[in-house]
């Protein structure tokens, strides 16, 4: 259900940036207030990312007011903070559908709107893309401006500094807005720095600055003295040395919730030459007290009533696989102080909060730097420690070279706890864990495990901890576990051995992972054998051979891309054994999986019990 726009009289006049730019600047504070209220109520209806968007309302209004979007390019990093952008760019009436099946995409998405100039979802990509667009703009000579908006969290990623180093060297015209919400806005930032930013971005100062550079060009000693004097003046209130050293002109920090100051500063900066950084200070969750006090807890929210000032209470249910991992990690750390846990800024999502509090000296948050996190773990393994890398499937993609070159090649005993394997649902194609089995299976020295339930997950984690001949991975899905009883005692599983769960006739279903329950349900109608394969690599070749010899048809089931996945491994072994056999591979198709609830996506892909049965019957009928 969409909101009644008549409750937002000024925002109603700004359904697009063109309409926004027709309004007098004096109305912009009211636009921002109504936009924040609209966002608050809209996310309450739809669920979704919340605190980040509340913090970028004034910034979004100012950007679309000053810049001629979509002609001017605006790139959002990650995109959690882009809900206000969607509201102001013609998608206001569809905001209640965001992250839902057939609804608005959770992140800026090129296919959705001309205002979304670059599709995003992973961190640290905006400046690289913006630099390319700035280079293209210079070649076109059409007067196009380019702006990248990036948060302070994303600034921890190495790709960001690679891009800034390149941009500073090329010196193309572009603006990087650094949205810094790590600290509250002090009076100093809100007043003095707003004035200083407008002064330093103004025409008189920049003309003087550029003219001085030309005059002093042939006098390097004097030029260096002048540069140091300027840095001393700015350094009294401005922490911009790093950006200046990278070749950027730095302005700020300024109050990111003062829309008039943002507009005036951006107007001044719009025509500056070379790469620019505008540093703004914002508050995550701005305007909604619970989110201001707990921005992490309110980062993403279910449907809720904003008037209650709390998230809806949920009945205690099954633990999530992330919680199963977190408990195992604490249990094993109690036994072994050499266990070290590493995560790339995913403490909460990976279930590591308790561990980080109880074992702070054994916990390492590498920030949004997946490559560094994996090689850090390799170094720990070299020194005899037991590193455990907790990482989402989609983010492990970013450290693929490190996984191969720094871990597997050296046969280092690093345990990868891979969360969000398979369908994640509402976050869509940028976050589905569709490829990990495929891209890990081809790496020598890897052991890859796919648990069917929480108890098997716990035992597999212990198996990986005990395995010292090389790296191992335990891959589990997002969401609640299956309800299986967890055995507290930990036992290492025999490497590369599966378990027969049901004995049937004619058809054998070889299951990899948590679709086992659905496979068993489908098997009842087919009187099929069901095998919990457990290990994707090394594959239980003896069991595959036995199933091929005693059944007419083999069916592989996995929540991973069919291409190169676990089922492909079964086919490779049958080929190697010279055993021609009818094999149906069930898994994720050769496409990027769209957003929707996990249940909806699973049903649409025919990966629930009903769908598995239908796929097998259709195959048998051919």
Curated annotation (Swiss-Prot):
Annotated residues that bind thiamine diphosphate are located at 80, 121-123, 153-154, 181, 288, 370
What terms describe the molecular function in GO for this protein?
1-deoxy-D-xylulose-5-phosphate synthase activity; magnesium ion binding; thiamine pyrophosphate binding
Give me the comment on cofactor binding: Binds 1 Mg(2+) ion per subunit.
- Record key words, sorted: Isoprene biosynthesis, Magnesium, Metal-binding, Thiamine biosynthesis, Thiamine pyrophosphate, Transferase
Q: In which pathway does it act?
A: Metabolic intermediate biosynthesis; 1-deoxy-D-xylulose 5-phosphate biosynthesis; 1-deoxy-D-xylulose 5-phosphate from D-glyceraldehyde 3-phosphate and pyruvate: step 1/1
Disulfide bonds listed in the record = none
Binding positions for Mg(2+) per the UniProt entry: 152, 181
Source domain of life is: Bacteria
Cofactor(s) this protein requires = Mg(2+); thiamine diphosphate
Entry's Gene Ontology BP terms: 1-deoxy-D-xylulose 5-phosphate biosynthetic process; isopentenyl diphosphate biosynthetic process, methylerythritol 4-phosphate pathway; terpenoid biosynthetic process; thiamine biosynthetic process
What EC number(s) are associated with this protein in UniProt? Answer: 2.2.1.7
Which chemical reaction does it catalyze?
D-glyceraldehyde 3-phosphate + pyruvate + H(+) = 1-deoxy-D-xylulose 5-phosphate + CO2
Task: List, alphabetically, the GO terms of the cellular component aspect.
Answer: cytosol
Q: InterPro entries from the entry? A: Dxylulose-5-P_synthase, THDP-binding, Transketo_C/PFOR_II, Transketolase-like_Pyr-bd, Transketolase_BS, Transketolase_C, Transketolase_CS
How does the record describe its quaternary structure? Homodimer.
PANTHER family with a match to the protein in the record: 1-D-DEOXYXYLULOSE 5-PHOSPHATE SYNTHASE-RELATED (PTHR43322), 1-DEOXY-D-XYLULOSE-5-PHOSPHATE SYNTHASE, CHLOROPLASTIC (PTHR43322:SF5)
General function of this protein: Catalyzes the acyloin condensation reaction between C atoms 2 and 3 of pyruvate and glyceraldehyde 3-phosphate to yield 1-deoxy-D-xylulose-5-phosphate (DXP).
Similarity remark: Belongs to the transketolase family. DXPS subfamily.
Q: What is this protein called?
A: 1-deoxy-D-xylulose-5-phosphate synthase
